[in-house]
């Protein structure tokens, strides 16, 4: 109760930074329990105001804006999440309301006004009245704030035992609730004295209770039929006996000598568990296995081929027990391409299993930009000096769906395999368009069904964080590591496919940074594609310079300055080199850094009905800007190839 009272004061004054190191604990002779002593309240009354911070708040919820109302509890309590869920687990809702009401009655108007007037007079003139108003508002809403806090940590309850022998009883009640009680265990294996932990978990509030046995020879007994509240028992260093014969449905995770006496639906998992690396500055915090994050994701870019691609979507992640980095994830986006007056939408999903590396997912899309141009087949097709002419436009709507199984082979190496279905519908408005005149195989409505397999190695990191600290993956500005991806597809004779064909495509990129934050980065990439058999035109190996493909196996097209799909053939090969140089720091709304970049590209296609030795080259440069962190990078560049120009703006870089 003393800790809860202190935490309620924390949320009332808006101090979000209440991590474990900001508490002291004292033992008084007249009290059996250690008493909490709050320390270093240095983030109270913070007002992170402004449009930019409001946009950043969903991703960084601790950027609180103090007012007379309580914000979401995640940001307000995030830094103390491990301690809250461990030490407040034994308190039920009535206790929270009672302690909140007690604290509310002690914080009088007089106390608030007196405290505010202790500020320097000059500062009180600026903000004193607003601070008094906000404090009184939060004080008046303290009971509601306490209930929101309670509900936030009640979804998954964690019960930690000690290193001594304990007796745990889990009783599922007829009304759907679950009663958990913990006693000291006597020499006869029976409970002794009064329970030192007792809590009734209510359906609709709690999804799961996790009982951590720690050391000692503990005994857990379950009673009653399983209900909506999942019961997990996590074995410790001692020998535990979990008697589920009178209950059922209990899940025991124990890599030691634990024993499960099973009931209906019981499950024992003895597979070793290796948790992910914890935060470098908070190594005691366990992996997140509760709650859900829902974020807005913008989808913004510009290329001379598509114009502005404007849109966005949501990225939602749910977290579960020993399902890392999340139990499920859904990314749903849609965008409009202004130059082509068409759209693209996609949906990527992942589903993880408990304490297993293998996971499943799918990728689905609907798009009018996948096959936007057609110049014919060959490495030397002409464009009449105008690669942007409507003659070369190829309007096709494509729909695709690929469910996959993902199998980790080694650290950072994953293999995925699954069926693929794709359907295209041509919508050509220009009668004199080249594709209307040639009508290649695949023209019109075309459906295909096949299989896709991908092998991916990804060790990209933000080099400035290594070796001094834990490196993290940064796709916005990779400065170290490498990425290798190889994808194979087979399309058998079925639907509109006249004969079986297939393809293999791959790319490899490496990032070299000889130094720290201000050192330049040399990014190198090589790749290609080979198509086998008689294939529809939109499955050809293309070489172009647009913003590139968008699917999970697609990379940016590799010769900047060219039009999308400028050259098509049976095979394509390319190479890219980018030099990204830091110039200086800046402060526009938020602190950041900026620099310049230069690039050179080269590539060609091969076509069975043509003999060509020509290579297509592109070159250019631009600027990059990074706010707060290099992961938040925006690049703007200009490319030129064969007398044609391209302008590109995007999050991150081309690769």
Feature map (PLM): residue ranges:
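Conserved kinase catalytic-core helix
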Residues: 2-18
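Catalytic-loop signature of eukaryotic-like protein kinases
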Residues: 15, 20-27
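C-terminal catalytic region of ATP-dependent kinase domains
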Residues: 26-198, 203-208, 216, 222-230, ...
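Outer-membrane beta-barrel initiation region
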Residues: 49, 212, 222-223, 234, ...
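C-terminal outer-membrane beta-barrel translocator/porin domains of Gram-negative envelope proteins
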Residues: 282-294, 341-350, 362-394, 399-404, ...
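Membrane-embedded beta-strand positions of outer-membrane beta-barrel proteins
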Residues: 298, 330-334, 360-364, 415-419, ...
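C-terminal beta-signal and adjacent terminal beta-strands/loops
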Residues: 598-613, 629
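Outer-membrane beta-barrel "beta-signal"
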Residues: 623-625, 644-655
């Amino acid at each position: 109760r003393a800790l809860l009272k202190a935490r309620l004061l924390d949320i009332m004054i808006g101090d979000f930074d209440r991590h474990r190191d900001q508490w002291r604990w004292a033992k008084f002779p007249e009290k059996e329990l250690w008493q909490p002593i709050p320390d270093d309240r240095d983030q109270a009354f913070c007002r992170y105001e402004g449009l930019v911070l409001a946009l950043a708040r969903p991703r960084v919820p601790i950027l609180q804006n103090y007012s007379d109302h309580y914000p979401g509890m995640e940001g307000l309590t995030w830094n103390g999440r491990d301690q809250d869920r461990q030490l407040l687990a034994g308190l039920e809702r009535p206790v929270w309301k009672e302690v909140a009401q007690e604290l509310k009655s002690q914080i009088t108007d007089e106390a608030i006004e007196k405290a505010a007037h202790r500020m320097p007079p000059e500062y009180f003139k600026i903000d004193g009245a607003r601070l008094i108003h906000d404090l009184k508002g939060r004080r008046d809403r303290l009971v509601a704030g306490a209930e929101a806090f309670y509900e936030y940590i009640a979804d998954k309850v964690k019960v930690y035992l000690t290193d001594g022998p304990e007796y745990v009883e889990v009783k599922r009640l007829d009304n759907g609730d679950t009663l958990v009680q913990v006693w000291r265990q006597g020499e006869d294996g029976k409970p002794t004295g009064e329970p030192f932990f007792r809590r009734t978990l209510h359906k609709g509030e709690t999804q799961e209770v996790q009982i951590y046995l720690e050391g000692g020879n503990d005994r857990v007994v379950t009673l009653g039929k399983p209900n909506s509240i999942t019961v997990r028992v996590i074995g410790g260093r001692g020998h535990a006996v979990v008697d589920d014969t009178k209950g059922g449905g209990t899940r025991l995770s124990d890599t030691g000598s634990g024993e499960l006496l099973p009931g209906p639906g019981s499950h024992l998992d003895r597979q070793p568990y290796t948790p992910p690396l914890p935060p470098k500055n908070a190594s005691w915090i366990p992996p997140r296995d509760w709650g859900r994050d829902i974020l807005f994701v913008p989808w913004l870019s510009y290329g001379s081929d598509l114009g502005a691609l404007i849109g966005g979507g949501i990225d939602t992640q749910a977290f579960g027990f020993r399902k890392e980095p999340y139990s499920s994830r859904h990314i749903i986006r849609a965008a409009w391409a202004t130059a082509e007056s068409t759209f693209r939408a996609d949906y990527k999903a992942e589903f993880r299993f408990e304490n297993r590396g293998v996971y499943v997912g799918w990728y689905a899309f609907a798009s009018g930009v996948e096959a936007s141009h057609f110049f014919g087949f060959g490495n030397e097709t002409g464009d009449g000096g105008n690669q942007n002419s409507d003659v070369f436009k190829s309007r096709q709507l494509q729909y695709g769906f690929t469910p996959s199984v993902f199998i980790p082979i080694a650290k950072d190496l994953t293999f995925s395999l699954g069926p693929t279905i794709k359907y295209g519908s041509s919508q050509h408005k220009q009668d004199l368009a080249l594709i209307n005149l040639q009508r290649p195989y695949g023209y019109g409505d075309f459906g295909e069904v096949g299989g896709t397999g991908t092998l991916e190695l990804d060790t990209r990191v933000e080099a400035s964080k290594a070796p001094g600290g834990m490196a993290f993956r940064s796709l916005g500005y990779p400065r170290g590591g490498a990425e290798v991806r190889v994808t194979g597809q087979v399309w058998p004779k079925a639907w509109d496919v006249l004969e079986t064909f297939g393809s293999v495509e791959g790319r490899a990129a490496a990032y070299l940074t000889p130094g720290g934050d201000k050192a330049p980065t040399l990014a190198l990439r090589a790749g290609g594609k080979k198509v086998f058999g008689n294939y529809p035109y939109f499955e050809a190996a293309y070489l172009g310079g647009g913003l590139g493909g968008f699917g999970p196996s697609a990379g940016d097209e590799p010769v900047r300055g060219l039009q999308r799909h400028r050259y098509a053939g049976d095979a394509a090969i390319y190479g890219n080199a980018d030099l990204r140089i830091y110039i200086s720091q800046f402060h526009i709304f938020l602190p950041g850094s900026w620099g310049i970049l230069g690039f050179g590209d080269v590539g060609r296609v091969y076509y069975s009905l043509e003999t060509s030795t020509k290579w297509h080259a592109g070159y250019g440069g631009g600027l990059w800007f990074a706010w707060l962190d290099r992961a938040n990078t925006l690049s703007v560049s200009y490319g030129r190839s064969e007398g044609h120009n391209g302008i590109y703006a995007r999050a991150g870089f081309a690769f």
